[in-house]
């Protein structure tokens, strides 16, 4: 596990941000929060994050648009999208924009979130080694 990885949690629901912040910080990650896509993009442009965990359905710039903009900027940031409104269309868009993983909320098992984060960071490290 990359215990020093910087992770940005993006969700307009503050309770979800707090839950994920606590969960990830407890595993040794450096965690920041953003409560909108615009705020997240500002933070990403200011300092690099190894991983972004973002809700899809947010007002303004949603998670998929944010993901598209991150990829457009050629950033190798791992992006995991999450949603409480799962649909085939959103899953296809997430894959198209190269999301590392697609999680549905509410989370039945917080360990599944941690596993997705660890997989995403391991894949990123493997790609960097090529």
Predicted feature locations:
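Two-component/phosphorelay signaling modules centered on CheY-like receiver
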Residues: 14-32
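Receiver (REC) domain active-site loop signature in two-component systems and cognate sites
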Residues: 58
